[in-house]
Amino acid sequence: MEKQHVFIVGSKGIPAEYGGFETFVDKLVQYQSTDEIQYHVARLSDRNDEFMYKGARVFNVKVPDVGPGKAVLYDLIALNACLEYCKKMDFKRAPIFYILACRIRPFIASIHKAVEELGGVLYLNPDGHEWRRSKWSWAVQKYWKTSERAMIKDCDLIICDSKNIEKYVREEYARYDPNTIYISYGADLEPSVLADDDEKFTGWLDEKGLRADEYYLVVGRFVPENNVETIIREFMSSSTTKDLAIITTENQSLYNTLERKLHFSEDPRIKFVGTVYDQELLKKIREHAYAYLHGHQVDRKSVV
């Protein structure tokens, strides 16, 4: 029996380094339970080639730096590569094209038509409320919203990883009668392979000036929607003797803005500790946090 070919476009690719979609795709191929599926995953790169990773075919996509439109161009180039690959291979079984996030409004109708001509189907994960992000200008927010509407209208199946997102899609776009399904993300419940006294963990604690079980932990991208400002402000007003460890991406502009507002650098308990891409180390850091603070406002998932 011919394999079911699934083409995934919209993440930055695998192996995952950061991001919810990237981690989702990485775990999807890692825990594949049948050999009847062949995944093809687009990966943003500075070259055009391909390689195998955990059984998935990963194809690199080189995209010119065109500024804010780079992500849109990446999706389009990747989708075109998927379509051309399918034409060349002439699969007997209908291919599945799975798009992550709603970026390509002006092109979705023609893409859907091309997929249909191949006998394929088009799936979409609409992500969170991207159009609500305060980092976007009004015009960009408007584009995200109209792109969301067009893509939900033209895709064959909307896969939601949040019950609230599925409810929103069904209610907001009821006139299109969208075909939706809720599929939650799994969770890795296995403890870290690192021992409590592993030098990798203890060395990290020493480097960051932290003590095991004596810190509150925040993990997520450093963007306004993750409410880092609120977390820091309220933490500064507390009397706890524990630290606040913030594992996050770099955003110097936001960092400077919050420093001007809050003067958090004067509070030695608050520690920006950079990113952690070693998943076993990150697990161990989470295991020894006194508590985890989650301030995410528009995301459904958060992995750093």
Task: Report each predicted region and the residues it spans.
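Acidic donor-binding loop of glycosyltransferase active sites
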Residues: 284-300
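N-terminal strand-loop element at the rim of the active site
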Residues: 3, 9-17, 31-69, 164-166, ...
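Glycosyltransferase donor-sugar binding loop
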Residues: 43-47, 187, 219, 242-259, ...
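Conserved donor-binding/catalytic core segment of Leloir-type glycosyltransferases
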Residues: 7-9, 205-226, 232-239, 245
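A short helix/loop element that forms part of the nucleotide-sugar donor recognition site in Leloir-type
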Residues: 193-209
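An aromatic- and histidine-rich active-site surface loop
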Residues: 72-84, 94-126, 300
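A short, active-site helix/loop in glycosyltransferases that binds the activated sugar's phosphate group
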Residues: 152-180, 187-192, 201
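Membrane-proximal helix-turn-helix segments that form the acceptor-binding/catalytic region
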Residues: 140-158
